[in-house]
């Protein structure tokens, strides 16, 4: 149980730090005016690998795949900045994934509204 609690605390701390890094320290002009939110972080058992789920609100004509590619290409720099801000023996390798839960939730809400109001 203690291992799970530690894993939860570390993943939350990594989530906070990566959110801050993406928002304030990642200076890629292609990511300006794009809201990137870190939804969750899944760590491997030995904390050497982290899967980061991001939600993206896009005002530009950039696809989700392009944004994820930009983040993945910047993952070494993000990992370096993460190592400066968090004190762990092993800083995990970062892998970014698109979190589609917001889009799926919106679709389900629209379907429910259509059923309820279009009788």
Swiss-Prot record:
One of several proteins that assist in the late maturation steps of the functional core of the 30S ribosomal subunit. Associates with free 30S ribosomal subunits (but not with 30S subunits that are part of 70S ribosomes or polysomes). Required for efficient processing of 16S rRNA. May interact with the 5'-terminal helix region of 16S rRNA. Monomer. Binds 30S ribosomal subunits, but not 50S ribosomal subunits or 70S ribosomes. The keyword Secreted does not apply. GO terms for molecular function: ribosomal small subunit binding. The keyword Cytoplasm applies. This is Ribosome-binding factor A. InterPro entries: KH_dom-like_a/b, RbfA, RbfA_dom_sf, Ribosome-bd_factorA_CS. Transmembrane segments: none annotated. It comes from Buchnera aphidicola subsp. Baizongia pistaciae (strain Bp). One of its GO terms (biological process) is maturation of SSU-rRNA. Belongs to the RbfA family. Its main location: cytoplasm. GO terms for cellular component: cytosol. Pfam families: RBFA. It is found in: Cytoplasm. It comes from the Bacteria. Keywords: Cytoplasm, Ribosome biogenesis.
């Amino acid at each position: 149980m203690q291992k799970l609690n530690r894993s939860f605390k570390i993943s939350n701390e990594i989530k906070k730090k990566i959110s801050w890094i993406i928002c304030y320290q990642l200076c890629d002009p292609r990511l300006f005016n794009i809201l990137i939110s870190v939804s969750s972080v899944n760590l491997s058992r030995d904390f050497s690998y982290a899967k980061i789920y991001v939600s993206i609100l896009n005002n530009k004509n950039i696809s989700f795949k392009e944004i994820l590619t930009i983040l993945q290409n910047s993952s070494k720099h993000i990992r370096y900045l993460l190592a400066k801000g968090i004190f762990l023996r092993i800083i995990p390798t970062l892998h970014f994934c698109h979190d589609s839960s917001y889009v799926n939730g919106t679709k389900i809400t629209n379907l429910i509204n259509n059923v309820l109001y279009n009788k």
